[in-house]
Amino acid sequence: MHCKKYDIPENLFYDTNDFWIKVNGEEAVVGMTDYGQSNTGDILYLELSRAGEIFKQGDKFGSIESGKWVGNLTAPLSGAVLDSNNELERNPRKVNIDAYGEGWMYRIKLSDPNELKSLMACREYAAWVAEQETSEEEKG
């Protein structure tokens, strides 16, 4: 599915911090959405949590720096990091180039699958993105 110029795959969950989540049983792969990476701009630096780190939904689980923005990555779900994409620390632009592929950030073990209910499906996220775009156009 596309929303304006952004790719929004239908088989994923999304949050309002512009993360995508691909669930497989009790595990999930997490990355930044196409919309998120586009708004962030060229990503210059990423610091990711390491395997074994445990976090709650909404906790900081990394940091990011781009030409436009410096800030924290906020966990979309509670869990433990099983693996992080260390290649992104050497080449963070992979998030800009292939957000849903080589730009993945984490593989996590979910600690509360009920939190999936707080996430958006493709169509909900597409509507949210369209709303954000309209809001930005009205401001600028």
PLM features: residue spans?
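Mid-chain, well-packed structural core segment of small domains
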Residues: G67-E102
